[in-house]
């Protein structure tokens, strides 16, 4: 088997040198046969020193003329033969010790950083001419030995779908002077074609850059720069390429198109031969103008048809009831303030200020007046939300001379013009008999107006509901649209799904005997088609869709047909959830388990759960103050626990007796003497005589057994009564305290929303149900807790300490800071002192209080039989050892740490308007208070039945919906009593306490003139928006367009971030 010789680096070097010699010979032959002779050129003195010492056989660095101080650009073309020979002759021969002189290398690529890289394998195309054309490169037209002032670096772009949004840039020298001269063999100098001025891209990028493409997706241009966009595949990967294209030459000859293109785009001018086909600003401005015209034309189609009735004419005859009073006009009127009207009104037989009688909305200026009169005679129609005022007035002609006027409200004298009205006292004595009743008050010019007023008298008309008005609820231009009822008149009969419409009702479509009302574009188109192709609704739909179509077109071109819809979705719509709620309500819920409230759906607090991470802190036994004793009618010979076993329990006595160091014992003989006081036989004076001790002593005296009978006041031994008591601090076997530390605490509130269970916490305070979303204002979690589980003789309870204990501070002696044992056998704290035993008589006033700390009270109780007695023992707290005892725990802990101070706030948003069942039973205990036909709502209160909302009606007039239970509402009543109330089914009679319209008659004088009656107006934001709806609509359209353009810019910047930091 023949052996193979491995290829070494020396063999590769020889092969590269041979290839380099062949290529250099070809380049030299092509340069000598050029059609245009190259004149000899003197070497620049600035570079002669640098070239003189350079090895001619080594690779030549080609440097651009950008920022390096060179006037000649060697990267444009190789030097002429004469200059090459001169360079070789001036180059010293290499030293013998070095390698043989190297032959010319293949062309190298200038990196722009003073270095060069070998030319990579370009792959297809195989011809340098095809490679240059594929790059969009055009060598210069002029002589390469001269300067090229227009030479610059241009940038082309490539990106691959397989690499995401990673962009690659390729920088090349480019000129706008047209095509260069060809060699005699019809070829360009390859050195002129491969002339990069930036870092060499990766090999796969260069291969994709030189890959011929079969079509052109688009041509883009701005000013003198023109690019062609192509899509192609290299090895199964789809690439996008944006190549810089040449422009028309200065001599009029157009550069040839790339041979692989299939689409020719005609040039339109010598200055801008390659023109972008779309994107002129005129098209965008024309689109905005078209949108403005469409919106203006479709004004009637954007809003539903509403009953916008004009002000009615004065009633014929006047719609007033009762009598009027016109005999008290001599009184001066009350001057109002803050622009309100003033006047003294007569209600019944009493005089009252106008501000106390007229409705509140009249005082606030929420009414409009229509002045149809001159200064001699006129008719005034004042319309409010609930009533109309009518008035016909006659004025006297003004006097010839001005008259000063001074009032109590303003002491300054107001100068009147030459044609001033009559003095204030003139005309006030006129009778109201010639006036129409139903005259309404006038509005002041300002509060300090001192001019004469006009005579006002009459009654208000019957209350009227405002006309029905609708509005369309637009949701960011997204369907569906809804119809919103602003005001509703019951007699119009508008219903939504069979339910009467009320102010605030949202419904896709309303139905009434008059027809249908809707805001839906689809319904509008259908109605437009049905109504002989009316243009109103069609234009409304066009205005709705036009901004989005325009945004899509602009984005599609701005992003070069990539990602316009994705950018709009990601930037504009992805982070926004359009509201789809039908109703929203807010209420409170108490924090006790079982509490319930009524939002659009019932919500009940099922329970409260506590979650935490638990760390066991051990267990300890608290000191227990324990006492025992006996009342005996004889003196036993053995006073130990065994000897007193017949009277004292053995187990506790032994437990106390064993703690002698902390035990307290006394023995009282003849506890009850003839005087009935307690005495201790063991206490003696120094002289040996006895005395009565009316109060008990501390346990400092040993038991009295063994003394003589003389110490017992002479009673026989068999009649002596003795008391034995024993007390001590001990460890009780059934009293323990276990400690647990809780961290990362969290309170879980268990709610029931219309039968659906859900849990809310501070981290997730929302509850999503089929009925809608419930947001709960959850109180903050308590934080770290310490739990004390106290087990006292079977009665176990837990106490909670807020926060971690400060064992290096004031809590150092607390039970939680002591060393505990797992089996609860360790007593916590130091050994306490002895307790105090007190022998207390049964009638001692001390027994009305509680034993003090560390005290035990013993009271003998004489039995009902001879030689029978008992003992009553009361033990107090734990004395000085309270720090170690459960009393400290009770003082520093709570039983419920997660109970918030206030109720929970509930905000409920329904998915759609909730249709709860309607109650049909009549309401009970309904009372009506107020007046009827007076323009002021009457108060209706009662108890609504269960089973759903009650749609309350009074004498057939709809009042509104009320929830089950007690309700209080206001209603305008147009009928006199009696009143029949119902919820849609059976009716019941309500008790009424109302006054008739005659009691609402009024007369008076109000300041102000005709011309200034409505000079002072107030406007709410809603009224301002209604008056400027056209500007708001146009602004919304412009905002949508701006949002779309910003979305496109964001998307394009995301894809073109390679221009800032390319690979």
From Swiss-Prot:
Which positions bind Ca(2+)? 670-671, 718-719
Topological domains (Cytoplasmic): residue ranges?
Answer: 556-582
Gene3D superfamilies, per the entry: Rubella membrane glycoprotein E1, domain 1, Rubella membrane glycoprotein E1, domain 2, Rubella membrane glycoprotein E1, domain 3, Rubella virus capsid protein
Q: Name one GO biological process term.
A: virion attachment to host cell
> One Pfam family from the UniProt entry?
Rubella_E1
GO CC annotations on file: host cell Golgi membrane; host cell mitochondrion; membrane; T=4 icosahedral viral capsid; viral envelope; viral nucleocapsid; virion membrane
Q: Where is this region: Disordered?
A: 1-131, 305-347
Q: What are the cysteine partners in each disulfide bond? A: 153-197, 590-595, 619-824, 641-653, 699-712, 758-767, 807-817, 931-934, 950-983
- Modification(s) after translation: Structural polyprotein: Specific enzymatic cleavages in vivo yield mature proteins. Two signal peptidase-mediated cleavages within the polyprotein produce the structural proteins capsid, E2, and E1. The E2 signal peptide remains attached to the C-terminus of the capsid protein after cleavage by the signal peptidase. Another signal peptide at E2 C-terminus directs E1 to the ER, with a similar mechanism. Capsid is phosphorylated on Ser-46 by host. This phosphorylation negatively regulates capsid protein RNA-binding activity. Dephosphorylated by human PP1A.
- The annotated regions of Basic residues compositional bias extend over 59-69
Source domain of life is Viruses
Q: Which residues are glycosylated?
A: 353, 371, 410, 429, 658, 759, 791, 1011-1012
* Human C1QBP/SF2P32-binding as annotated region, ranges: 30-69
Bias (Pro residues) occurs at: 93-107
So where does this one cross the membrane? 535-555, 1029-1049
Query: Where is the stretch described as Functions as E1 signal peptide?
Result: 563-582
Stretches in topological domain Extracellular: 301-534, 583-1028, 1050-1063
| Notes concerning its domains | Structural polyprotein: Contains two internal signal peptides that are necessary for directing translocation of the glycoproteins into the lumen of the endoplasmic reticulum.
Q: What is this protein called?
A: Structural polyprotein
